[in-house]
Amino acid sequence: MKKTIMASSLAVALGVTGYAASTGHEAHAAEMNVDQAHLVDLAHNHQDQLNAAPIKDGAYDIHFVKDGFQYNFTSNGTTWSWSYEAANGQTAGFSNVAGADYTTSYNQGSNVQSVSYNAQSSNSNVEAVSAPTYHNYSTSTTSSSVRLSNGNTAGATGSSAAQIMAQRTGVSASTWAAIIARESNGQVNAYNPSGASGLFQTMPGWGPTNTVDQQINAAVKAYKAQGLSAWGF
């Protein structure tokens, strides 16, 4: 899935790679004597700092590849954005700052997700898709939802998928909802650079995951072959 970011103040300058045109020149990190290791650390571990302030004063357009990821940092001097994506083009994380309101839409046919921002406020919005964290967890359940101790949930789509999985496998819907919450936080388009994707984070060998139905089918195949051990149970 390729993601694009569009902000009202960057609509002309920002394209599918997330670059903003500031001086007409896209500067590689080496050209600006940028500490790539520091920027990589910020993108993965300190996203709040990237959202709070630009990495330097004035306009800039920095992009570089490191350890299998493409990193982009742009600013027009007023608003700024940053992103990083796996080498295969799957966006791992991005943010466009100085936008208070945003809407998201997903085109299932073209596998493109767009985020439109209203850049009239200093508030920031962040959307990120990252590899799932595996740990011991506890769940609280209602008739239609599961919430893990870390706050992850299966979401509306994930809860529906869990019900279908229960019908097709005989395993309780709450168990499947917990798996979905842990693996993807209910994000249909969740992607792990390892290749796992979808609500259930199944590997490509179990089948395509472009749609929720395909994700359910892939999860059923994985379950029939490996049982719940496919998800570490």
UniProtKB/Swiss-Prot annotation:
EC number(s) per entry: 3.2.-.-
Entry keyword set: Glycosidase, Hydrolase, Secreted, Signal
MF (Gene Ontology): hydrolase activity, acting on glycosyl bonds
Stretch forming the signal peptide: 1-29
Protein location: Secreted
Gene3D superfamilies cross-referenced by the UniProt entry: 1.10.530.10
SUPFAM superfamilies attached to this UniProt entry: Lysozyme-like
Recorded GO CC terms: extracellular region
Highest taxon above the source species: Bacteria
Function, as annotated: Is able to cleave peptidoglycan.
UniProt family annotation: Belongs to the transglycosylase family. IsaA subfamily.
Protein name as catalogued: Probable transglycosylase IsaA
